[in-house]
A protein has these predicted regions:
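Short Gly/Thr/Asp-enriched flexible loops that form oxyanion-binding sites at enzyme active sites
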Residues: 20-24, 212-226, 291-295
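Electropositive, gly/pro-rich neighborhoods at or near active sites that engage anionic ligands
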Residues: 29, 39-180
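A short helix->loop->beta-strand "cap" motif at the edges of active sites that frequently abuts
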Residues: 31-33, 229-233, 278, 299
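C-terminal functional extensions of proteins
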Residues: 246-330
Length: 330
């Protein structure tokens, strides 16, 4: 593996955090390498007067080693006394729990936002508390929120925040379309475009292609930066054996007319040689039969183990990503 790499990863929450942990481990012995994560903010929302940033917080807690691995979100050893009190007062959403430790971050973030501090600067302040080994940048400082238009059997067609659709309804209401409100007027956060331009490797992580990666790419300027960077752009499939690894990406892909398959997602991103975003694409070993078709479409593809079962498998996958990027660069 080449040394002294500037690695940039586009990432969502749980899958992105586990992959980033692997990238950090893969380059740990190379003090000259840097890892930068450009993180989805489309899941963000206002709740009980506080600005909540689920994906940023999940990645922060995971890299800091203080996350709740069993739940996949929140702080380890969390209590929920304040959340219970809020619910007793009828404040917030009873189905969306705010942990007591988590609330500390939300209150600090909201206080700084009300003082006019940009979200990217706030993330720098929050991450300074722990040695993450990864630089986190929100995709934008502007408010962008993902909303879902659903078929509700009780009320008909209506729109709701993504968190309501996912957390309350467990994506059980059929999604008609996804809307990233505010994305057309958003600008990339400070450092985002420079990171992509100066990267040696850019990775589209194994996060939801629609509501995580799709939201990042929808911010004007970011997709163009991926097309124009001199770095190889490689991606990791979030689909294994025709099924999602975690979450609701299958329902999201169906809503935009993309099959839930590793090859379909790779071709959805497209090849840079044809105006798309990717040079290389990794699928799982169970999808090895898809590799020839992917390569026929112009993408360099490999089949490797994709399951992020533990830090070791995450690091092994990260090494495969960097190996593919090196081959694409040649």
């Amino acid at each position: 593996m080449p040394r002294d790499l500037n690695i940039v990863v586009l990432a969502g929450g749980v899958g992105g955090s586990r992959f980033l942990r692997g990238v950090r481990a893969a380059v740990r012995d190379d003090s000259g390498s840097t890892v930068t994560a450009i993180v989805n903010t489309g899941d963000d929302m206002w709740l009980a007067g506080l600005r909540i940033t689920p994906d940023l917080d999940t990645i922060l807690y995971t890299l800091a080693g203080i996350n709740d691995e069993q739940r996949g979100w929140g702080r380890l050893g969390e209590t929920e006394r304040v959340s219970a009190e809020l619910q007793a007062w009828g404040v917030g959403w009873p189905w969306f729990t705010l942990g007591d430790l988590d609330l500390g971050a939300h209150i600090a973030r909201t206080s700084w936002l009300r003082e006019g501090v940009p979200l990217s600067d706030i993330v720098t302040r929050l991450t300074a508390r722990w040695p993450l080994g990864v630089r986190l940048i929100p995709s934008t400082d502007d408010e962008v929120e993902t909303w879902v238009e659903v078929d509700d059997p009780d009320t008909g067609i209506r729109s709701m925040h993504f968190q309501e659709w996912w957390v309350k309804h467990r994506s059980g209401l059929p999604a008609r379309r996804f809307e990233q409100r505010g994305v057309a007027d958003a600008t990339p956060a400070a450092g985002v475009l420079d990171a992509i331009r100066d990267a040696d490797v850019v990775v589209i992580g194994p996060s939801n292609p629609v509501v995580s990666i799709g939201t990042i790419l929808g911010i004007p300027g970011i997709a163009d930066a991926l097309r124009e960077t001199a770095a190889p752009v490689v991606g990791v499939s979030p689909i294994i054996g025709g099924a999602v690894v975690r979450g609701m990406a299958d329902a999201c892909l169906t809503a935009i007319g993309v099959d839930t398959s590793a090859d379909a997602v790779g071709l959805h991103y497209g090849t840079r040689s044809s105006g798309g975003l990717l040079d290389g694409w990794l699928v799982d070993t169970v999808d090895e039969a898809l590799v020839p078709g992917i390569e026929a479409a112009g993408l360099t593809a490999r089949a490797v183990p994709l399951w992020l079962r533990d830090p070791e498998t995450s690091a092994a996958l990260a090494s495969e990503v960097l190996s593919l990027a090196a081959d694409v660069r040649r």
